[in-house]
Amino acid sequence: MPSFDIVSEITLHEVRNAVENANRVLSTRYDFRGVEAVIELNEKNETIKITTESDFQLEQLIEILIGSCIKRGIEHSSLDIPAESEHHGKLYSKEIKLKQGIETEMAKKITKLVKDSKIKVQTQIQGEQVRVTGKSRDDLQAVIQLVKSAELGQPFQFNNFRD
């Protein structure tokens, strides 16, 4: 029986490249001359910390980072950007988490979405991925289109497609 896996992964190497590129853009921006502004990647915790002197500049840095991520093929929805910024002395900062893997709640939403669509396939939650099996390739491709078109707030990849 044909099957495939629905996963949500980010290549940390591409994230590192995006952060380095954003720092390069930051160093050439005229409005950030003489301003203490830093974008740092913590690969262990899978977070990006942005620090600068004002709230407005913080939003500008986030826009620079998002632009760099999109150029590197990382979707905006894979960044979990907090609404409130932290204020320490004269510095403002935000810690952006990278969304890796599919949490159980999201996996249940995907399973419910597929079951409600009445496509003749079975779904199984396997850790941080969802396996979809069906009798025909067309059913599996319909599930791929269904999940892509659903606004679930997280990017998904479809791999391990087997006949």
UniProtKB/Swiss-Prot annotation:
GO CC annotations, alphabetized: cytosol
One of the record's GO molecular function terms: nucleotide binding
Record Pfam families: DUF520 (PF04461)
Domain of life: Bacteria
InterPro entries for this protein: DUF520, UPF0234-like_C, UPF0234_N, YajQ-like_sf
Entry keywords, A to Z: Nucleotide-binding
Record text about domains: Composed of two domains with a four-stranded antiparallel beta-sheet flanked on one side by two alpha-helices.
Cross-referenced HAMAP family: YajQ
Function, in words: Nucleotide-binding protein.
Protein name: Nucleotide-binding protein YajQ
Native source species: Haemophilus influenzae (strain ATCC 51907 / DSM 11121 / KW20 / Rd)
